[in-house]
């Protein structure tokens, strides 16, 4: 019998996908969507499959930005910290949901950092929105 494991399967989940329908989103709604996602992943891949999940977090970061702007007395955090917070939040919810679906599986959350060139000309023409879209000013 061959004990060699196959390469891991990478699944990318969009930040909007993890929230469901148009917001505002509650914590319970986010958990329900993540729980359904974990159910689908557990039913799609067998317990021996090494699975790597990656996810977006644009709308989640936007929600935190809106919360910070609404809290006039609280000092605002920088965007990089908000990104890390939402990575950890989503990772926590996914890890908990996957642990519930497959208690025998080893699941972990990893918060990442990206190094960018502050002089990159792409900063002059941003194309990736963060947060909600508004229909009027």
Over which residues does each language-model region extend?
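Ligand-binding beta-strand-loop-alpha-helix segment within the catalytic cores
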Residues: 70-137
